[in-house]
């Protein structure tokens, strides 16, 4: 019996000690608002940086974001592999009735509360807990203490990073990789999203923003070679969502035309998805009035489509309004989110938006990757934002936490899928065999 228990201990130790994969350095880019067709085959001809990356690595047809196709929900989905109703970051604007605290797209101090962030553990926290060195640049949330942990370094987002900020972040990250100071570097860049909002997804301004990113990425491939990192660094580039055209003043739904705003306890967000908390005793009245409004759908929480993986979120409101593509919901026209244009006044019209049904074509994002663990010149089928996490865990050599991603959708892009498969705890089959053997 002593020999059996000794053998059992050895089996358990060996099974727990299996590595997740080869442990290489990982550089991650989150390019906000980058729609999948911005790098179509035709578009790549005028984007030498992206074209080189595609030829050297993997490009998926498109990436489907989580619902709602907004930034913060997908920032967390990408870094946890979990749907919004699981990680609890369900919007850019949230309200917790129990504490009367609000999350307002990261601009208020209450947005830094663990209340919003501790619903799941993002990859950068897992790596930091594993004694990996994590450097983050402008990444929303890196300044927050999550589950009692902060990354090694966080250059906090305060204003929209410039193209020079972006280039400097890339250069600095590569220097930290070269010196051995970093295991993971994550860089966030927003300008493509900003220009897409202000001028529209097909505008010259959005195209110029993309070309500026392309130039930096072209230099990046050269800098990797100069620092002799090409055999030890994987690079992954993805976006949180796409962008579609909107037409202000033509396709606006003003709630004050249908209901009394005094009958609402709270309203969060404007645009494709709006959250309403009716005042006590007003739920049915508001719901029935809004059911008749064209170009949008009003859902009671329990009736939200299951395919959105949204309704179980703890911060989801009693009523959720979802606009048809291109339509914009607001309390009234005066509260439309104008932006400060060249006049110095907040009077600029928004011409692009996102947040709509995540299955719509214009909401699709991108995923690119290259490096020693990825196939070269490989085109992959579409993936979903929940799938990205497992890829990052695999090439970083870390065991993924339980998640909603599909390994089968991403395994094709890796050179050695067997050694790159996410590590797991001992399987039920192995444990069952051990138990049967002990009882024999």
Swiss-Prot record:
Cofactor note: Binds 2 Zn(2+) ions per subunit.
Binding site for Zn(2+) 2: 193, 197, 354
Annotated positions binding Zn(2+) 1: 32, 71, 240-241
Keywords recorded for this protein, A-Z: Cell membrane, Disulfide bond, Glycoprotein, GPI-anchor, Hydrolase, Lipid degradation, Lipid metabolism, Lipoprotein, Membrane, Metal-binding, Phosphoprotein, Signal, Zinc
Glycosylation sites (chain numbering): 100, 118, 341, 404
Residue sites binding substrate per the record: 32, 71, 92, 193, 241, 354
Active site: 71 (nucleophile)
Catalysed reactions, semicolon-separated: sn-glycerol 3-phosphocholine + H2O = phosphocholine + glycerol + H(+); a 1-acyl-sn-glycero-3-phosphocholine + H2O = a 1-acyl-sn-glycerol + phosphocholine + H(+); a 1-O-alkyl-sn-glycero-3-phosphocholine + H2O = a 1-O-alkyl-sn-glycerol + phosphocholine + H(+); 1-dodecanoyl-sn-glycero-3-phosphocholine + H2O = 1-dodecanoyl-sn-glycerol + phosphocholine + H(+)
The name this protein goes by in its record: Glycerophosphocholine cholinephosphodiesterase ENPP6
Disulfide pairings: 142-154
Claim: Aminoacyl-tRNA synthetase is one of the keywords in the record: no
Keyword Mitochondrion: no
UniProt EC number: 3.1.4.-, 3.1.4.38
GO biological process per UniProt: choline metabolic process; lipid catabolic process; lipid metabolic process
Domain of life: Eukaryota
Lipidation residue positions, type GPI-anchor amidated serine: 419
Cellular component per GO, a single term: plasma membrane
Modified residues (Phosphoserine): 71
Enzyme class: hydrolase
Molecular function via GO: glycerophosphocholine cholinephosphodiesterase activity; glycerophosphodiester phosphodiesterase activity; metal ion binding; phosphoric diester hydrolase activity
Subunit organization: Homodimer; disulfide-linked. Homotetramer.
Function: Choline-specific glycerophosphodiesterase that hydrolyzes glycerophosphocholine (GPC) and lysophosphatidylcholine (LPC) and contributes to supplying choline to the cells. Has a preference for LPC with short (12:0 and 14:0) or polyunsaturated (18:2 and 20:4) fatty acids. In vitro, hydrolyzes only choline-containing lysophospholipids, such as sphingosylphosphorylcholine (SPC), platelet-activating factor (PAF) and lysoPAF, but not other lysophospholipids.
UniProt similarity note: Belongs to the nucleotide pyrophosphatase/phosphodiesterase family.
Bilayer topology annotation: Lipid-anchor; GPI-anchor
Pfam families: Phosphodiest
Propeptide regions on this chain: 420-440
